[in-house]
């Protein structure tokens, strides 16, 4: 089912849930809504589900405008962060509930519930109640309940946030696998960018009720169109630095106090043409500790992450986060030389926060 | 504490553990003491006094406040009561009054008001519920006066003034339909209790659960039937139990409205009879002993009903397992 959202606004009195959202989702696509808490992800999802009526704008499922269609007539499945299983029903009754409401014959219900339960690996739990299940099992039941009605659209609202890290990893793979197999158009709300990056075909990044970007994960990562997206996508986050970019004998130079970084024309010309100060962004993995680098600084803090060390290095008043091999055994206070891979640098307008390299 | 090689406890250790047990025992009773004292003073002692009065023939003619001087007559009052030709009628009046008021108003209407006011705009719901609390917080005398004014005979009654304006015949409403008025007047008061309990129970159902039901394909009515009602089962049973007992013992409104009439015992209920016999006999002779016999039977009926309700509705399960957590 293709979903087209045009200029969607949802307000609660004066509070803006989401504003002027336009988003076209292809049939069978897996889209993630990514953004910090309170940015309007759940509001958008519940509006799509028909729980909230849009204040303004149009929502279309296929060719049908669904703005005023009741939730029960939308054929959607939804998975909630809290699992939202009915505590007074057995697992069987929970999964069978959508079928019962559709007046599916009892024997067909029985068959379909068992089939879905087996796919979700909860076949043995059907007689229990939700309270007797672990979080992971409950989430499988919730997923089963959403799938059993063979929905046109699947909506996920932070379904893995209440699970422990290990289980989250397993479930992530399973949900993605299921979605690809079944080909159901899915929207997956999360504030965890790793989930969004690993699962989604495209990610809609939201902030304060507004859509910031809607792109494939690697696009968002390599060509962020706003400073917010650049800073939100990627872990550890991108480093930002106020610089002035100017031409310098055939090349370009990004300057901030004592820091001078040479730039090629491809990345240097647009910010130089912009005139005045700009915001430079550089990801931690694009800064290396070398013997002969661009600038010298001092290590302020070393945070061991296991596989690598997260290093906070200071160059004058400017701090940079970067990653280093643990075997190098860097220590706080050590003086180091840093090399910036300026072919990966990003530049943003300090006022509009839009990218100077990638136009929308 | 389990030790790997268990030795018999020394006598000092034994004494110590006994002391600990005693301390926790005293602690538990200490916490129960304030409630226990209240139950003792306001329930057990009055019951004992009434029980004693019910086996005496204390009346205005032989009044004494000295318990020792009262004349013991055994179960004579109870024998009189069971042979009283009106006791049977009053008994069934009571059952009728409690059952009808409870089922129509204290439970059903309370549930309907709760469901309606939780399905509309929050502040509008709040206003409607506040209106339904008015009968409860109005003093019974004022409240009954309002009803009497409404229903009074022509030319005083407000309803009858409308009838006259419209050229309709006038009625003596309370006299012609006393039970309707007794039930409605008490029912309007009874709605608020269930309404408050049901509303808070409905509002404590997690939003996700309610949304999930709609997304799963239920209409709002189906959601009430399959999700909301099962989830407020315990509050429902509690209201049924509590309100049965409270209706059994309530009589002030009936006393003010019909005083058990019109005619002989048309709307007289058991608790009102206890009052009439003991404190306001038609014949000017207050029969405290005989009235107490009525009161004692009422207490016994109440206790038996409470036990039956607790068994049938399995309230022990409610106490044993934190149901609320599962919500
Ligand atoms: N039912 C509601 N009534 C009033 N304000 C709401 C309601 N739901 C959400 N909001 C507000 O809308 C904004 C977006 O909330 P939400 O969509 O829940 O964010 P997210 O799911 O991204 O964390 C927040 O400011 C929130 O306070
Ligand atoms: Mg949310």
Language-model segments: which ranges?
Chain A
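ABC ATPase nucleotide-binding domains
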Residues: 30, 71-228
């Amino acid at each position: 089912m293709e979903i087209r959202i045009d200029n969607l606004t949802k307000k609660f009195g004066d509070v803006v849930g989401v504003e002027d959202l336009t988003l076209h989702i292809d049939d069978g696509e897996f889209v993630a809504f990514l953004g910090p808490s309170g940015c309007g992800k759940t509001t958008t999802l519940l509006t799509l589900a028909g729980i909230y009526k849009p204040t303004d704008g149009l929502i279309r499922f296929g060719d049908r405008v669904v703005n005023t269609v009741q939730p029960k007539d939308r054929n959607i499945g939804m998975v909630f962060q809290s699992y939202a299983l009915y505590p007074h029903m057995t697992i069987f009754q929970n999964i069978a509930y959508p079928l019962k409401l559709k007046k599916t014959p009892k024997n067909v219900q029985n068959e379909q519930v068992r089939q879905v339960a087996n796919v979700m690996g909860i076949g043995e739990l059907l007689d229990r109640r939700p309270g007797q299940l672990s979080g992971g099992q409950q989430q499988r039941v919730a997923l089963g309940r959403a799938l059993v009605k063979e929905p046109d659209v699947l909506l996920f609202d932070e379904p893995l946030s209440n699970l422990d890290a290990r289980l989250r990893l397993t479930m992530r793979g399973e949900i993605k696998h299921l979605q690809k197999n079944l080909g159901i158009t899915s929207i997956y709300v999360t504030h965890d960018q790793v989930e969004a990056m690993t699962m989604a075909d495209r990610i809609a990044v939201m902030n304060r009720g507004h859509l910031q970007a809607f792109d494939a994960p690697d696009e968002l990562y390599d060509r962020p169109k706003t400073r917010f997206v650049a800073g939100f996508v990627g872990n550890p986050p991108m480093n930002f630095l106020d610089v002035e970019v100017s031409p310098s004998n055939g090349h370009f130079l990004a300057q901030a106090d004592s820091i001078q970084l040479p730039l090629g024309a491809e990345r240097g010309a647009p910010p130089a043409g912009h005139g005045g100060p700009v915001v430079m962004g550089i990801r931690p993995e694009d800064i290396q500790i070398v013997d002969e680098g661009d600038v010298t600084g001092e290590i302020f803090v070393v945070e061991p992450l296991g596989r690598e060390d997260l290093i906070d290095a200071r160059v004058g008043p400017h701090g940079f986060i970067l990653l280093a091999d643990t075997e190098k055994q860097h220590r706080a206070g050590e003086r180091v030389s840093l090399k910036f891979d300026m072919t990966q640098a990003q530049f943003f307008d300090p006022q509009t926060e839009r990218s100077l390299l990638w136009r929308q | 504490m389990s030790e790997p090689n268990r030795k018999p406890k020394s006598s000092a250790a034994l004494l110590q553990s006994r002391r600990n047990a005693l301390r926790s025992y005293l602690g538990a009773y200490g916490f129960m003491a304030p409630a226990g004292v209240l139950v003792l003073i306001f329930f057990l002692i009055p019951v004992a006094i009434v029980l004693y009065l019910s086996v005496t023939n204390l009346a205005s003619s032989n009044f004494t406040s000295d318990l020792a001087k009262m004349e013991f007559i055994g179960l004579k009052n109870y024998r009189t009561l069971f042979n009283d030709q009106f006791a049977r009628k009053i008994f069934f009046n009571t059952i009728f009054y409690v059952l009808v008021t409870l089922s129509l108003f204290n439970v059903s209407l309370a549930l309907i008001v709760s469901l309606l006011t939780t399905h509309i705009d929050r502040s509008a719901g709040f206003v409607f519920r506040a209106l339904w609390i008015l009968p409860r917080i109005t003093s019974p005398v004022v409240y009954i006066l309002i009803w009497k004014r409404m229903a009074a005979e022509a030319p005083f009654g407000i309803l009858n003034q409308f009838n006259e304006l419209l050229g309709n015949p006038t009625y003596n409403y309370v006299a012609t339909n006393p039970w309707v008025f007794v039930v409605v007047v008490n029912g309007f008061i009874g709605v608020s209790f269930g309404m408050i309990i049901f509303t808070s129970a409905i509002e404590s159902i997690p939003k996700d659960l309610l949304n999930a039901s709609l997304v799963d394909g239920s209409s709002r009515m189906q959601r009430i039937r399959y999700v909301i009602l099962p989830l407020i089962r315990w509050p429902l049973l509690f209201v049924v139990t509590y309100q049965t007992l409270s209706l059994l013992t309530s009589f002030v409104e009936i006393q003010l409205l019909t005083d058990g009439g019109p005619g002989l015992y048309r709307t007289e209920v058991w608790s009102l009879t206890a009052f009439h016999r003991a404190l306001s006999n038609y014949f000017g002779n207050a029969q405290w002993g005989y009235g107490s016999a009525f009161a004692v039977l009422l207490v016994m009926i109440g206790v038996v009903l409470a036990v039956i309700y607790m068994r049938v509705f399995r309230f022990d399960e409610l106490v044993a397992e934190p149901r609320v957590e599962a919500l």
